[in-house]
Amino acid sequence: MTNLNASQANHRNFILTGIPGTPDKNPWLAFPLGFLYTLTLLGNGTILAVIKVEPSLHEPTYYFLSILALTDVSLSMSTLPSMLSIYWFNAPQIVFDACIMQMFFIHVFGIVESGVLVSMAFDRFVAIRNPLHYVSILTHDVIRKTGIAVLTRAVCVVFPVPFLIKCLPFCHSNVLSHSYCLHQNMMRLACASTRINSLYGLIVVIFTLGLDVLLTLLSYVLTLKTVLGIVSRGERLKTLSTCLSHMSTVLLFYVPFMGAASMIHRFWEHLSPVVHMVMADIYLLLPPVLNPIVYSVKTKQI
């Protein structure tokens, strides 16, 4: 019990930083962030509304797209409000429990998005492999259970993280190097060994995001094998074009994450705080903004 309360006894709040070295420009950064937030809500809200009111879009593909849009909105609502409070209202403080809650939701919705992308990849495979039985295979019940399974997995793997953080003592700086709370940043402020936290975080990344990448690649290999079996070249290209939106979304989500992870691993000691901040922001902020644009441009039904 003493260890569990140690962090709260030492730090009752954290200080979230804006972009390092630009305190005078922080208010101006609120405008593009506010624009991104508004664009995210409008874009994903429009996707949800169009799918709801248009009967021709009541198909498995668009139900999965609705889940993706809801996830994007939830992820944005977990990050952007705290960023706006820093840049717009100059209110960088966040209480310890609120920081842990924000960290929990950011990681949960990040893993949910990864799981939804895997589901959408196999949705494309089923649609191409068994077009005549597509709707009968991916029924409403199957889609609902898939969504519940994706959310349950995310909650279960992230659930221990708040308790691991609460067991750490924070007796030095309480300044976080980001505009929102993340597990890796919070544990770096601890004045005790974080080996367990680091090991658990690595396990989560490998067995969630890593596994999801492999499953997505597998689905595309199976899809490509099916497409190559189509005799007509025109039909092959037409079939492949139905996967472009999903492929773009996958690249938007995984490439920034892998790029950031690679750079941090190789150049950790030489990277400036600004680079850390920008990489994290690209990974968390851009996909929710760009996903509805990608689907609107590349999906003529929407």
Swiss-Prot record:
Disulfide bonds join C99-C191. Residues 49-56, 123-141, 220-239, 298-302 are cytoplasmic. SUPFAM superfamilies: Family A G protein-coupled receptor-like. It is found in: Cell membrane. One of its GO terms (molecular function) is olfactory receptor activity. Pfam families: 7tm_4 (PF13853). Glycans are attached at N5. Coiled coil: none annotated. InterPro entries: GPCR_Rhodpsn (IPR000276), GPCR_Rhodpsn_7TM (IPR017452), Olfact_rcpt (IPR000725), OR51/52/56-like (IPR050402). Residues 1-27, 78-101, 163-198, 261-276 are extracellular. Keywords: Cell membrane, Disulfide bond, G-protein coupled receptor, Glycoprotein, Membrane, Olfaction, Receptor, Sensory transduction, Transducer, Transmembrane, Transmembrane helix. It is a multi-pass membrane protein. GO terms for cellular component: plasma membrane. The chain crosses the membrane at residues 28-48, 57-77, 102-122, 142-162, 199-219, 240-260, 277-297. Its main location: membrane. Odorant receptor. Belongs to the G-protein coupled receptor 1 family. This is Olfactory receptor 51H1.
